[in-house]
């Protein structure tokens, strides 16, 4: 749950 603007793989 975040912003996949910088890291789409880390948008947890």
Swiss-Prot record:
Superkingdom classification of source: Eukaryota
Glycosylated residues in this chain: 4
Catalytic activity, EC: 3.4.23.-
UniProt KW Isomerase keyword: no
Gene Ontology biological-process entries: proteolysis
Subcellular locations according to the entry: Secreted, Extracellular space
Tissue specificity comment: Chorionic epithelium (trophectoderm) and placental cotyledons.
Main localisation: secreted
Enzyme class, broadest EC rank: hydrolase
Cellular compartments per GO CC: extracellular region
GO molecular function: aspartic-type endopeptidase activity
Keywords assigned: Aspartyl protease, Glycoprotein, Hydrolase, Protease, Secreted
Note: On the 2D-gel the determined pI of this protein is: 5.5, its MW is: 55 kDa.
Homology family: Belongs to the peptidase A1 family.
Protein name: Pregnancy-associated glycoprotein 55E
The species this protein was found in: Bison bonasus (European bison)
Species lineage: Eukaryota, Metazoa, Chordata, Craniata, Vertebrata
């Amino acid at each position: 749950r975040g912003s996949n603007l910088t890291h789409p793989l880390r948008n947890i």
